[in-house]
Amino acid sequence: PYSILPLVIGIGFGLYRINFQSSLIKIFLSGWFLGFGWFSFGLYWIGSAFFMTDTYHVILMPVAIILLPSLLAVFWGSACVCAKLINRNTKFSILYIIVFLSLFEYLRAHLFTGFPWLMPSMIFASNVYLIQVFSFIGSFSTNIIVLTLSILPFIFFSNFKAKNVVSLILLIPIAILLFCGILRYSNKSFLKNTEQLVTIVQPNIKQKNKWILKNREQHLNNLIELSIKYRNSLNNKNRIIIWPETSFEGSIPKEKKLLSNISEKILKNKNTTLILGLLRTYENKVFNSLVFLNSKGDIIHIYDKTKLV
């Protein structure tokens, strides 16, 4: 999340050191500690969620920010062990480590409901040119590209006899791929729709205040005011108005009447749609939902968030 591309060298250094370990236990622990460091520094922000309410949940924060990286790091440790089991030759096993680590990142994204956050490939997401690689080979295969780039400097400066040939073989296809990404972005074309306007409303309401019922009317008035601001100067353009996730205290279907009143105030144009986040209750279950509201106050679509990512 820091968008500092040179930091990827840190992964390469860790993988390079693991490559020369002989004991499977040491290899697993080294891979685990590398993964723990990666996920700890990248997922530190999860702890901030425990400060949203003044309850006992804050004491669980250390457990969350330590336990989650610890579990995710098992994938990295296991990948390193599998790579070493396939090839005991320390000179070449680093390439196997890269392949298996990329494979285990795919498994991490799908096993146990999946948690694909903070893959090494996400480093490319902070640059408009580098992220184009995703369109060619996808985010999972891009893990191989990022990990290979991270170890190239260490291969080049090592005592490995064929280091120049290996470095060149690895670098050429990556360079071609990156060049194609630059060309793709440089030759991009945009689809324009001058008849439709998207309005994103962010009232900047603190989470701990959002759930106070007595403040709901004030929060709603703020959302409505921001939604209709400059409406008269928009020449009756068709609009899509987007409110935040869990926009206000309340849930559907209990708040259908309230939603109808909101649509009367905001959706004057029949082709305008309000998209808002709202809780939905059904058979004693609570869903974090995306609600589409038309100008008549009718709910035309509902999408329930069933997975974290």
Residue ranges with predicted function:
Residues 1-187:
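Membrane-embedded alpha-helical bundles of multi-pass enzymes
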Residues 182-309:
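Soluble catalytic regions of membrane-associated enzymes that act on cell-envelope
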